[in-house]
Swiss-Prot record:
Cytoplasmic topological domain: 1-29, 83-84, 134-145, 201-204, 281-293, 328-331, 378-382, 419-444
Positions in the Periplasmic compartment: 54-63, 102-113, 167-182, 224-251, 310-311, 347-357
Entry keyword annotation includes Cell wall biogenesis/degradation: no
Residue ranges crossing the lipid bilayer per the database entry: 30-53, 64-82, 85-101, 114-133, 146-166, 183-200, 205-223, 252-280, 294-309, 312-327, 332-346, 358-377
Organism: Escherichia coli (strain K12)
Protein name: Adenine permease AdeQ
Length: 444
């Protein structure tokens, strides 16, 4: 009997080794399983944060919990099987806040129409991938603008986190002011942030998850939330699947929003794929990684599918580097992550015991990570640093990621032309800047 079990396990391991080419990548099934669990623990916070954010757009948090798990599970498994890369996918932080607080909240657009904008942005990304334009765009967008976009989104997310904790509140004279720091909600939000930063500085991979658990337990103690169980059959999601308003999103008013969703997702996912595969030692001398086109297809198709089932834009997660750090080198790592997300679907009642301040610390911490790239800007060259600065600060100050990107691209062209360095411009930058200028003239 024991011999039969041993043979079965050996055969299963052999199948996985052949399917994911483990020997060629110098890894084992055990290492890939550990790597998958590590990546999952570092990014599972998204199943709590995403429902909180999209809930602000009048979407049912429990349904969003399920769709988040579903798309993260299927997307990660697809990345593992088709591209054989240790990269996990899930709804993107930043774009979910943009959707909920700007597109739906500030602009007053229904979540169904907002999802339509995400859908068309994802379709655009797929077409760019199909016609091999995506890699050309990545290569031709200046580093300063890419950094400005990333950092601006980081500040935007941090602003949402500070607002959710109550650290900052509205003021009619000064726009914002410090909140009531004696409030237990504010104090717990601050506590959650420092739990993440301290644990992360000690290289603890599940820092964000621990912070959410600790502050949620405190929320139970103070009566801010109420325990309603742990396990349940996933709620019906038929009310959101296919509810995207595709025709309503195809308007001039939303053209800039659609373009922003596409552009941000293009930079975010492509940059993450390159970063993770580079850390895994999979990048060749030409800056490309194995199955690059397959990975880009999986990424863009996942975003289309995500909008269709009712969740925000899907992207590759930089947290995948945590799995790579412990030895993950193949798609088996991503498959393990995907399976874990699918299993988590059966724990939707847990969403109800996570108060807003419990996830706020994660938002602020993501802001810290994203703004750290500003150190790479050449601050001595004003034709590079000024557009990066404008892009970064105008996102939170205008409460619009789209406006930040638009002003960044246009200021880049202005600075280069007015300083006589117009030869630094390329077709991609000029076209994007011109499109945004036309949007401002014709629509705004």
């Amino acid at each position: 009997m024991n011999n039969d079990n041993t043979d079965y396990v050996s055969n299963e391991s052999g199948t996985l080794s052949r399917l994911f080419k483990l020997p060629q990548h110098g890894t084992t099934v055990r290492t890939e399983l550990i790597a998958g669990m590590t990546t999952f623990l570092t990014m599972v916070y998204i199943v709590f944060v995403n429902p909180q954010i999209l809930g602000a757009a009048q979407m049912d948090p429990k349904v969003v919990f399920v769709t988040t798990c579903l798309i993260a599970g299927i997307g990660s498994i697809a990345m593992g099987i088709f591209a054989n890369l240790p990269v996990a996918l899930a709804p993107a932080m930043g774009l979910n806040a943009f959707f909920a607080f700007v597109v739906v909240g500030a602009m007053g657009i229904s979540w169904q129409t907002g999802m339509g904008a995400i859908f068309w942005g994802a379709v655009g990304l797929f077409l760019l991938t199909l016609f091999r334009i995506r890699y050309w765009m990545i290569s031709n967008i200046p580093l300063s603008l890419r950094i400005g976009i990333t950092s601006g989104i980081g500040l935007f997310i941090a602003l949402m986190g500070l607002k959710n904790t109550g650290v900052i509140v509205a003021n009619k004279d000064t726009l914002v002011m410090i909140g009531d720091l004696s409030s237990h909600g504010v104090l717990l939000g601050i506590l959650g942030f420092f739990i993440i930063t301290v644990l992360s500085s000690r290289h603890f991979h599940a820092a964000v998850l621990v912070s959410i658990v600790v502050t949620s337990c405190c929320g139970l103690f103070f009566g801010d939330v109420h325990f309603s169980g742990v396990y349940s059959i996933p709620p019906d999601i038929s009310g959101v699947i296919g509810e995207v308003d595709l025709s309503g999103a195809l308007t001039l008013e939303l053209a800039g929003i659609i373009f922003s969703f596409m552009l941000i997702n293009l930079f975010d996912s492509s940059g993450t794929l390159i970063g993770v595969t580079d850390k895994a030692g999979l990048i060749d001398g030409n800056g490309k990684f194995p199955n690059m086109n397959k990975a880009l297809y999986v990424d863009s198709v996942s975003s289309v599918a995500g909008a269709f089932i009712g969740t925000s834009s899907v992207t590759a997660y930089i947290e995948s580097t945590s799995g790579v750090a412990v030895g993950g080198r193949t798609g088996l790592t991503a498959v393990v992550v995907g399976v874990m997300f699918l299993l988590v679907m059966f724990f939707s009642p847990l969403v109800a015991i996570v108060p807003p301040y419990a996830t706020a610390g994660a938002l602020i911490f993501v802001g810290v990570l994203m703004t750290s790239s500003l150190a790479r800007v050449n601050w001595d060259d004003f034709t590079e640093s000024v557009p990066a600065f404008i892009t970064t600060v105008m996102m939170p100050f205008t409460f619009s990621i789209t406006e930040g990107i638009a002003l960044g691209f246009m200021s880049y062209c202005i600075m280069k032309v007015c300083t006589g360095r117009w030869r630094d411009l390329n077709l991609c930058v000029v076209v994007v800047a011109a499109l945004f200028a036309l949007k401002i003239i014709l629509v705004d």
